[in-house]
């Protein structure tokens, strides 16, 4: 009997298949196993049966977090195709997923959720169900359902648990079919408050000071999925008062906010970043938000807006604050324009948070070079418990904040290299992403291994 069949058998008798190796079948039940379950297992397999007794709370928690379902054949027999999409989206929402991956594999479609930055699998579905699911998503996203050879992207909103939830959809032709990735754009009840982002007090003070300026360019940088959007929208929410006119140009509008004039670009209709920016400048804005600076033309438009009496906020894909300055110059932005307009750069990453209920220090402290961090770091481990199941729950942000001081402006104008810029910034009090990560490890917020997974060791150490 294969694993999907064993999974279905266990579920039939209110158990959960935890593992099935060549010699052992490991099953979890509430309180004690029923005779029916044991008889069925012994009839189905000659392997040794190991039973783990869970409380009802553990079983309910496991079910809600992993969304155990029937295997493909049984699932599709008892569950209409239309319900598969709802269950998948609902699972993503309940488990705090940021992305849903639906991808063709051998003899099945694989579904995975990205939770706290790591992909977790859901049960596979059959090729027919996968194709039907992909087609339904393309209809919702207003994509060409007959086009299978070219990538497409779109957006849709559905109601889940009584709330409107928006997703961004992107398709990609692959061997065996189309791969679909959904990005959850709006999380229900998501707080947008700069005070809860996780910045250190000095960083928060620098951020607040930049937002109080009547003009200038504030950039938030980092890779996809590093929390830039929440930081940007939190800043907009702080500025969102009755006496301020805020306009944004986005692709797409990720979080609708009341009293903001949010415009989504539509390149196929001729509505581009540059076109919207030109129109926004005729709308008497006080604050302009540009979803992302993707090219030199957009960068120059943003800087010119910042030089003409507007506070401009945007994002960029770079690894650190100082690299942002070099990246903008590579886009063709003149050094004098950059030094005169830029007021603050924030680089950020997200790391998984240790579960406070089961974390503990084990083994010897971790020693790293003194030039990276001056003291040993605690070695944290979290085996998992009823609250988290795998040792981590949620994520926390690490920040690197660079105020553009007169000295930094002079260095930018002088075409100073990244290393020298970072040296001067650190001498002025800037703490790097890795240094803030080490501080988070000291505080028990995350592990050193998680820090290395996200950032790697600096300077090749």
Show the residue positions of the predicted features.
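Polyanionic, low-complexity intrinsically disordered segments
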Residues: 1-43, 152-161, 166-170
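Core recognition of P-loop NTPase motor domains used across DNA-transaction enzymes
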Residues: 11, 15-18, 36, 40, ...
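Short, charge-rich amphipathic segments
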Residues: 14-23, 64-73, 142, 167, ...
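Short alpha-helical interface patches
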Residues: 12-14, 21, 43-46, 51-68, ...
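Short glycine/Trp-rich loop-beta-loop segment that forms part of the substrate-binding cleft
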Residues: 26-63, 198-209
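Short, basic, glycine/proline-bearing loop/turn elements
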Residues: 23-25, 69-75, 192-193, 261-263
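Short, flexible helix-loop junctions that flank or precede catalytic/ligand sites
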Residues: 12, 78-91, 95-461
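Charged, low-hydrophobicity low-complexity segments
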Residues: 43, 50-90, 95, 99
């Amino acid at each position: 009997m294969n694993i999907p069949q064993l999974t279905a058998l266990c579920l039939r008798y209110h158990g959960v298949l935890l593992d099935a190796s060549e010699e052992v079948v490991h099953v979890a039940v509430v309180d004690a196993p029923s005779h029916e379950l044991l008889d069925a297992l012994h009839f189905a397999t000659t392997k040794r049966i190991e039973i783990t007794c869970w409380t009802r709370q553990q079983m309910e928690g496991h079910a809600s977090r992993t969304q155990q379902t029937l295997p493909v054949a049984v699932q599709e027999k008892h569950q209409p195709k239309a319900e598969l999409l709802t269950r998948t989206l609902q699972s993503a929402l309940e488990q705090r997923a940021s992305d849903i991956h639906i991808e063709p594999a051998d003899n099945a479609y694989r579904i995975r959720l990205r939770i706290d930055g790591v992909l977790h699998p859901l049960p596979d579905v059959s090729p027919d169900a996968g194709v039907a699911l992909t087609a339904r998503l393309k209809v919702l996203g207003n994509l060409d359902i007959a086009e299978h050879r070219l990538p497409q992207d779109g957006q849709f909103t559905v109601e889940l648990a009584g709330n409107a939830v928006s997703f961004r959809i992107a398709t990609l032709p692959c061997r065996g079919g189309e791969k679909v990735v959904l990005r959850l754009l709006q999380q229900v009840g998501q707080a947008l408050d700069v005070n809860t982002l996780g910045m250190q007090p000095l960083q928060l003070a620098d951020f607040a000071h930049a937002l109080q300026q009547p003009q200038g360019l504030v950039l938030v940088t980092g890779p996809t999925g590093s929390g830039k959007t929440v930081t940007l929208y939190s800043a907009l929410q702080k500025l969102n008062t009755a006496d301020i006119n805020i306009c944004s140009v986005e692709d797409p509008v990720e979080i609708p906010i009341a009293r903001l004039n949010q415009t989504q670009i539509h390149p196929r209709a001729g509505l581009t970043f540059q076109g919207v920016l030109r129109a926004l400048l005729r709308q008497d804005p006080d604050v302009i938000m540009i979803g992302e600076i993707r090219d030199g033309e957009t960068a120059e438009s943003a800087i010119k807006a910042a030089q003409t009496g507007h506070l401009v906020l945007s994002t960029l894909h770079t690894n650190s604050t100082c690299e942002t300055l070099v990246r903008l110059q590579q886009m063709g932005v003149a050094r004098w324009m950059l030094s005169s307009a830029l007021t603050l750069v924030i680089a950020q990453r997200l790391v998984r948070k240790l579960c406070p209920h089961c974390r503990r220090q084990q083994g010897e402290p971790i020693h790293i070079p003194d030039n990276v961090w001056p003291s040993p770091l605690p070695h944290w481990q979290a085996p998992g418990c009823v609250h988290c199941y795998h040792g981590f729950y949620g994520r926390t942000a690490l920040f690197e904040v660079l105020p553009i001081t007169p000295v930094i402006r002079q260095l930018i104008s002088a075409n100073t290299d990244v290393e020298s810029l970072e040296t001067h910034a650190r001498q002025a009090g800037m703490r790097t992403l890795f240094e803030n990560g080490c501080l988070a490890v000291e505080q028990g917020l995350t592990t050193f291994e998680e820090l290395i997974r996200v950032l790697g060791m600096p300077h090749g150490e």
